[in-house]
Amino acid sequence: MAVQMEYEKDVKVPALDGKKIAVIGYGSQGHAHSQNLRDTGHDVIIGVRPGKSFDKAKEDGFDTYTVAEATKLADVIMILAPDEIQQELYEAEIAPNLEAGNAVGFAHGFNIHFEFIKVPADVDVFMCAPKGPGHLVRRTFEEGFGVPALYAVYQDATGNAKDIAMDWCKGIGAARVGLLETTYKEETEEDLFGEQAVLCGGLTALIETGFEVLTEAGYAPELAYFEVLHEMKLIVDLIYEGGFKKMRQSISNTAEFGDYVSGPRVITEQVKENMKAVLADIQNGKFANDFVNDYKAGRPKLTAYREEAANLEIEKVGAELRKAMPFVGQNDDDAFKIYN
């Protein structure tokens, strides 16, 4: 089904005007949503547990409260804490302080779609999901445009949930560049699949396997790193700017011919079947339950996965090479320490 892009002109109702807005969490998305909304004239407070984020929110000029206090004061509550802690945060501090007619929002449908969080029937549930990390949501807003966003309504108790979702998207700058309406089911399942099969899981596995093939064949690890990882950004930037067409117009004929000949040998029908199995585990809730259960057990699996990944040869080689390439960005130890 085709969807239609919507813009600021399509946001007809200033549904957030006169509302007290509580942003729960002041991490990557939390700092961006709250600052952008404040800059567009909205009344924003922060709800966060004591710690660095609490101190940072106060430093940035926000009235900052506990999560329970902020919920009690607000008409619209946007939950931007990490997925894995939202359920306990909601049950302990948000749910007891909700009132009929409130609206609760999310930037990802995980906890609502998989029913880890159940909001009372007399409360609106909406979504505004920017398609980019928080630092880009903030930076592009300050530059006069924004990051596109998806919006959705899960529960419309007041009849105003869609207007609230769209006005929220407008308030953070997303409607300047485009909004797409979706559902909680669609956003959640597609987002998880994209992360697991392509953007994160699929991509890192492809890079690591390519690195292993080259080094096991006797090629220098440093050269293998450049061929399978360092140059990835150059190719992805071209695809981002103009699709496969621009990428193929920009590479050599040799590379383009190899693309057509060898790509299908790597991503075979069996790989497609494996991707379908990944999607099935997302759709039936297996992945969600595995993730939440691991968190509740103290994250033994996630910790083990992180330790294993940190010890990959490609990571060690890359860390050394990047020391000689300051042009690639921040130092590894400082990268993305944004509003933690």
UniProtKB/Swiss-Prot annotation:
It catalyses: (2R)-2,3-dihydroxy-3-methylbutanoate + NADP(+) = (2S)-2-acetolactate + NADPH + H(+); (2R,3R)-2,3-dihydroxy-3-methylpentanoate + NADP(+) = (S)-2-ethyl-2-hydroxy-3-oxobutanoate + NADPH + H(+). GO terms for molecular function: ketol-acid reductoisomerase activity; magnesium ion binding; NADP binding. The active site is at H108. SUPFAM superfamilies: 6-phosphogluconate dehydrogenase C-terminal domain-like (SSF48179), NAD(P)-binding Rossmann-fold domains (SSF51735). NADP(+) binds at Y26, G27, S28, Q29, R49, S53, D83, E84, I85, Q86, G134. Substrate binds at S252. It comes from the Bacteria. Residues 183-328 form the KARI C-terminal knotted domain. HAMAP family: IlvC (MF_00435). This is Ketol-acid reductoisomerase (NADP(+)). It comes from Streptococcus thermophilus (strain ATCC BAA-491 / LMD-9).
